[in-house]
A protein has these predicted regions:
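N-terminal intrinsically disordered/low-complexity leader segments
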Residues: 1-5, 194
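Helix-turn-helix
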Residues: 9, 13, 17-51, 55
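Hydrophobic alpha-helical connector segments
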Residues: 55, 69-97, 152-156, 176-180
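Short, basic, alpha-helical segments at the C-terminal edge of helix-turn-helix-like DNA-binding modules
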Residues: 58-63
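C-terminal peripheral helix-coil segments that are non-catalytic and often amphipathic
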Residues: 85-91, 129-137, 159, 165, ...
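Amphipathic alpha-helical segments used for helix-helix packing
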Residues: 93-117, 168-169
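Amphipathic alpha-helical packing segments from all-alpha helical-bundle domains
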Residues: 95-98, 114-140, 150-154
Length: 194
């Protein structure tokens, strides 16, 4: 039987420690101490440190995907759905610096670990395809100029990742506004003239 409270406590402790110390510098023992569980409890839920890290990554990216879907669902049309996602930047920037550091830690760990890189690549491909589909639909409906949907989606995803990284290296209140204005600039460049 899975005790969700215990499992969530372990996940929260790991997320905090990974964002503070990094993947390599965080031990399973430290995670267990912070979560106030035994190593046996840890291994009951997660067979390895890597599988634990991947579950944190998966939960984080599923939450992000859910929020993106919510913005798209509540928009009036394809172009507005993309534009409305600028509000997501505001939410992301309010989530705090530890989330940004955790994101960078996922990227860093992915460089050295093939399984983590594979999981990151799957999500980046998912997001790219998702945005490409929205853009293709916008082109078909005459809302967006005839651009290459896949290339445009890559630009949007790359911009989002770059903006998150900039917030880590230059944390100030301006990044939220710069992010929204930047995505608007990208979207205005593909909007079909009336």
């Amino acid at each position: 039987m899975v005790d969700l409270e215990t499992k969530n406590r372990i996940l929260k402790a790991g997320e905090e420690l990974f964002s503070l110390k990094g993947y390599d510098a965080t031990s399973i023992q430290e995670i267990c101490e912070k979560a106030e569980v035994s190593k046996g409890a840890f291994f009951h839920y997660f067979p390895t440190k890597e599988s634990f890290f991947l579950e944190i990554l998966d939960l984080w990216l599923k939450d992000l995907t859910s929020r993106i879907n919510e913005y798209v669902k509540n928009a009036q049309n394809i172009y507005d759905s993309l534009l409305k996602m600028t509000e997501l930047f505001k939410e992301i920037f309010k989530e705090s610096r530890p989330k940004f550091l955790l994101f960078i830690e996922f990227l860093r760990a992915g460089i050295r670990d093939e399984n983590i890189l594979k999981k990151l690549s799957e999500y980046f491909e998912l997001y790219t395809n998702y945005f490409a589909q929205i853009i293709a639909e916008g082109i078909q409906k005459g809302i967006i100029k005839p651009v290459d949907p896949k290339v445009t989606a890559h630009v949007i995803v790359s911009y989002a990742i770059g903006t998150i990284e900039q917030e880590i290296f230059k944390p100030d209140n301006q990044m939220e506004e710069i992010s929204r204005e930047g995505i608007k600039l990208i979207l205005e460049s593909i909007k079909k003239e009336d």
